[in-house]
């Protein structure tokens, strides 16, 4: 990476450099009105439904489509807990493939007419629990130093994510005791 390659970048170039200090940073389109683009790396956070313990935390290089990150997250969960989960609840960004081996991927959708009231309530409760993950991510950013990474490179970012998840789990463990 030299100064001329940065200066000669065009608007439509694929692999642009957005930061001199962190060249692995990519542009992520969020679609928010006040901030349509963010610069950084994508994360994949997996946690349990009831206790809120983080089972997997991955920093993903580039800007991959959410649906393509499920395999890596499932592989990490299986390595950590020894078995693959039966149900994975995700947001609407994970549309596409619904089955990953023994794991079923559920995303929010309009209930079907054939669903009973019980099934509809069960689905609604599942997705309300999934929405709690946003609070977990917010806590990781504010209280566990994931808002800004002070370690260099992609490996430094991965280390930062894992350490933040470990610190969060320690706090949860202390609260559960």
Model-predicted segments: where are they?
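Polybasic low-complexity intrinsically disordered regions
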Residues: 1-86, 92, 99
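Helix-centered, glycine/charged polyanion-binding patches within enzymatic domains
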Residues: 83-155
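Charged, often Cys/His-bearing segments associated with DNA-binding zinc-finger transcription factors
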Residues: 175-176
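Membrane-interface transmembrane-helix boundary segments in multi-pass integral membrane proteins
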Residues: 156-160
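Acidic, carboxylate-rich catalytic segments that either coordinate divalent cations
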Residues: 172
């Amino acid at each position: 990476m030299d100064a001329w390659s940065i200066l000669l970048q065009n608007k439509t170039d694929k692999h642009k450099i957005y930061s001199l200090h962190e060249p692995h940073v990519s542009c992520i389109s969020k679609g928010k009105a006040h901030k349509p683009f963010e610069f950084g790396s994508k994360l994949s956070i997996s946690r349990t439904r009831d206790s809120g313990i983080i089972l997997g935390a991955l920093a993903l290089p580039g800007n991959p489509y959410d649906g393509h990150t499920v395999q890596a997250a499932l592989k990490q969960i299986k390595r950590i807990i020894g078995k693959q989960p039966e149900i994975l609840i995700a947001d609407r960004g994970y549309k596409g493939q619904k089955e990953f081996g023994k794991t079923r991927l559920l995303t929010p959708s309009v209930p079907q007419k054939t669903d009973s009231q019980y099934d509809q309530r069960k689905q609604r409760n599942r997705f309300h629990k999934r929405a709690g993950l946003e609070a977990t991510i917010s806590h990781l950013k504010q209280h566990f130093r994931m808002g800004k990474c002070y370690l260099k490179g992609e490996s430094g970012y991965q280390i930062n994510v894992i350490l933040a998840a470990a610190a969060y789990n320690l706090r949860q463990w202390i609260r559960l005791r």
